[in-house]
Structure formats: structure tokens, C-alpha cells
């Protein structure tokens, strides 16, 4: 079910009554309750598809429970990640530098962004994982590959389930069109593992403030949106993830709300490509990670992406006389090239606003290859 909230997004006339009772973020005092979706569909698949579509339209983010990913698969991924990050720095560097794949520390991208973290980025294909595995787990690279591949397969299935539900909830003529983008054999999906050690900067702030909250939280990973189609995140029980609510972002406010950790759940958020594909109906939410002085935070994110040649353009069902095309057509490769020239916090989609003479709406690729 979706956690009730005070206000609902626009969901179409048929869904208006349901949207009024089930909105996106429930405000309780100064806190915010993240929308929760039970993926086991206790009220039926039709209601589940509407719930997922409402959550992604209103906030671009939800907590998925009863998601079907086996706990043993998640536990094995956690153990493999922890075993890597506990290694000596020189040993971890053998899996780097991040170009953009591999091991990295503090530096995020090539444009000056830094954070209080270390990370490992892998392409989500078995062959790509195998090529890096010997530098990550020299004792048993095949074991590491198997753990990552099992995890990727389970989380990819969850991502596909979400995208199929979105296709149904949005009323697409072909509800599987979004899923086919990330299941193409040459998809560009990634797996990213972030490790945030307790922050010395935050500890210094605690000391200066007499043990109270640090005046300025240490930034583990700065403000950004995810560029791909969909992100599926799981983390341990350390907090740190924060969201910038869409209404606050539109008003130019910087009101960040914390997301309570839940290691048993997955957190799903809309990426830039999905916002473009749905002509802005679904929202790519801005988020960041702050680091405290408590326990380390370990998170694993599956970034579901299409092939590099995939053509990203608003789906026909999302364009109408009252809802003109917001973004011009582009390929994922073009979007990535632009992304690599910008700082982390840049609103990348602003550079792809539609102009006169853009092509027809649709989703596909440059050479009709899937």
C-alpha cells in the first residue's frame, strides 16, 4: 500500500479520487514519511500499477517492500562489499582508477566534485564484472562475480517489474516498452557500491558544538539527480540519504528531508531519462547523502540504463495539446557525453528542452537494434 498523505499529485480524472487519499509524501510534524509500496500486490495488480505511477509522478521516489529479492542474495552482496572496503588502500587501488568504472575515493567524476566516500562502479554485465573481479577479490574472483551477478539479476527483475507497472499505470499502448530498454543485450546498466566511513569533519563539528548536532553536515555525496532510467538502492541501517522535495525544489528552497534507513527494503527513484520519456509526468528527484559520526553507511545501487544508441523521446501517450513536448529527442550516448562535462548538481535536462522542429514522439534507437 501507499502511505497516506495530505496532498496528491495530478493523476488523471480516473485516478483523482484515489490520488486524493493516497499521496506521495506524508508530513508528520517536521518529518516526512516516504511512500511505501507493497510489491506483492495485496489489492491486485491494477491497483499496484496505479500506486507505483502515483509515487513516481508525485515524488519520483518510493520504498518497495515484499519486493521478491531473496535476503540471502542481498546479504551475500553486503558481505562481498564489506570484504572489499576493509582492505588496505593500496590493495583497493588495484581495482581503480574509476575511468569511469572501477574503484575511486572522494573524487566524484572529473569536474571537481568530491565527497566523503569510497566507491566501486561496475558495468552490470557478467563479462564486465568478470574483467574487474580479479582486482577486487584476488582470492576467489569467480565467487565475487557470482555474488554480483546474482544480485544484479534479482534487482534487474525488480526494476523490470516496476517499469512494467509504470507502463500499465501510465496507460501506455505497449506497457513493456520501458522494460525493453533495460533488458536489451547491449544495455548500459551499472552497479555502484558506496562506502561512507564516519566523518572526521562531522566529528569536529560535534566537538565544537559541545556534543550537539554538527553546524554543517559533512557531504558524503553531493546534490544530484540520477541520469539513467531507474535507480534501485539498498543500504544498511545507517542513515544519511536525504531528498529535496519536488515542490521545494521548484520554489528554490533547500529543504532536505532524511529518508529513514530500512535494510529489508529497496528504494526506487526515477532517473532523468524516465522523466524525459514521460514528458515530465514522472519526476527525477534530487537527493544527496550526508555523513555523520556514527556507523559507516554501505549502499548498493543498480542504475537501469538503455543501450548507448537508444533514442530517448517523449512517449506518444504523454504528449497532447495541453501537454506539449518538453524535451527534444536525444540518445543516451549524447546525454552521457553532456553529463560528463557538468558538475554533479547541474540540472542536465535543462539543456535538452524542446525547440521547434523536433522529431516525432516515441521511444526507440538509432538503428532499430535491441
Curated annotation (Swiss-Prot):
Q: Which family does it belong to?
A: Belongs to the iron/ascorbate-dependent oxidoreductase family. GA2OX subfamily.
What SUPFAM superfamilies does this protein map onto? Clavaminate synthase-like (SSF51197)
Key word Cell cycle present: no
The gene is GA2OX2
- From the UniProt record, give one GO term of the biological process aspect: gibberellin catabolic process
What sequence ranges are listed for the domain Fe2OG dioxygenase?
A: 186-306
Its top-level enzyme class, in one word, is: oxidoreductase
List the Gene Ontology MF annotations in alphabetical order. gibberellin 2-beta-dioxygenase activity; metal ion binding
Cofactor(s) listed: Fe(2+)
Catalysed reactions, as listed in the record: gibberellin A1 + 2-oxoglutarate + O2 = gibberellin A8 + succinate + CO2
> Could you give the cofactor binding note from the entry?
Binds 1 Fe(2+) ion per subunit.
- Amino acids binding 2-oxoglutarate: 196, 297, 299
* EC number of the protein: 1.14.11.13
User: Which residues are Fe cation-binding?
Assistant: 224, 226, 287
The name under which this protein is listed is Gibberellin 2-beta-dioxygenase 2
Going by the UniProt record, its keywords in alphabetical order are: Dioxygenase, Iron, Metal-binding, Oxidoreductase
* Entry function: Catalyzes the 2-beta-hydroxylation of several biologically active gibberellins, leading to the homeostatic regulation of their endogenous level. Catabolism of gibberellins (GAs) plays a central role in plant development.
Give the matching Gene3D superfamilies: B-lactam Antibiotic, Isopenicillin N Synthase, Chain
Q: Name one Pfam family in it.
A: DIOX_N
Keyword Iron assigned to the entry: answer is yes
